[in-house]
Amino acid sequence: MKKIFIALIALFSVGVSAQQPFSGIRSSSYLGVQSTLSNPANIVASSKKWDVNLLSFQVNFANNATDLKLSSVKDDLFKLENDKISGVINADVLGPSFMVGGSKFAFALTSRARVFAHLNNLNTHLFKALSENKLTENYVLQSPENQGVTANGWSEIGGTFSMVLFQDLNHVIKAGVTAKLLQGFTSSYVQINGLKDAKIEIDGNEVYLSNANAGVVMLNSGVDFTNLKNVSDITKSYGKGIGFDLGLVYERQLESADDWCPNCGIGRGYRYKIGVSLLDIGGIKYSSNPQNSFQYLLNVPAGKRFRLDNLGDNLTQIQENLKKSEYVKTGGISDSYKASLPTSLNLIFDYYAGSRFFVEFASQFNLVSKEDSAKNAYYANSYSLTPRFEGKYFGFYLPLNYSDLSKFNAGVALRMGPLFVGSGSALSVLTNKSKQADVYFGLRFGL
């Protein structure tokens, strides 16, 4: 058991999403095919006739408990004062992709891979008892919520079509849709529920649980990253599904040609733009791996004790020891299950102030229900304000973000010709006052 929880610590101690993907740079009018990720309607009647993405990626780590200091993040994150901790690691890679734009219609083809790992409401006293045996006094758990760990990884092949629905001298309305073929390569979750008022008791070097009526569920499908023997296993399909992105954009054209906004789109360009998109509709169906999937019902009456600190160092040992206990019964496991995509509603308002200066307000709202979050990927609700300066070959971006998970962060991004690099939290990380760390990079070209 200790080795499993040490692996969990390693997962959430790396300085690798609470916020919107590619925060800051996603507001650019020059991204081309990359702009389909936030709204598939963006590419029609835009500044790009064609665009090719060679490689873009982002890694992001966020938590609700502690500011990130690389020298002490593990100890700070899991200290007992935090009580309940939640966190997320997200990696997003946009592979070779291209778009062809036009004044009425536009098309794009994208390849993408994404990984989410979530830590949900983990009680730090229970964590310490199972992983490190460092508790010095008895403790009554106050954990009405489900707690656990979730990991999902999948690849996407997407086709985007967008068109102008209406256009006159002052107004443009655009719509777009992306259909995605999904291939899942890993899905795992461990969930513990029903531990409210359960008691952790310390007896010398031994740790016991009493007065507990709880359930423990683990479902696993696809690549086992704790025992990965062949990297090529990641390219195999362990689950399949279909997903969709839907988008709508309204642009209010500039009042006169004298105020013309270069490369803001068709006509004179826009004074402001309003975008609404519903992203990541759909999910992936997996078959459960019977060797690594189980459900146990734990019932330890008051006055009785169940030992926690010697369950074992791997899943096989843990399952064998649980089955031997008089307080544990085995439950049934579904042969298959569905993991939802991180469905979200995205809203943006982008205003052109003149002289190549813009400011964008964007918000992202999670639409994945908390009841289903045990096995699903999801984003935290977030809001951002991004002032930016944009020329044809250079752009500077200053994203200011707030999320339900990691609170306030400030970042910076640069676009220089075909290259862009940035972070939604770099400025906050430099002050050691950030619960989030992220970085992104991209290489693309177009006309």
Segments predicted by a language model, with ranges:
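Subset of outer-membrane beta-barrel
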Residues: Q19-L447
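Sec-dependent N-terminal signal peptides
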Residues: I4-S13
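Sec/Tat signal peptide C-region and signal peptidase I cleavage site
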Residues: V14-A18
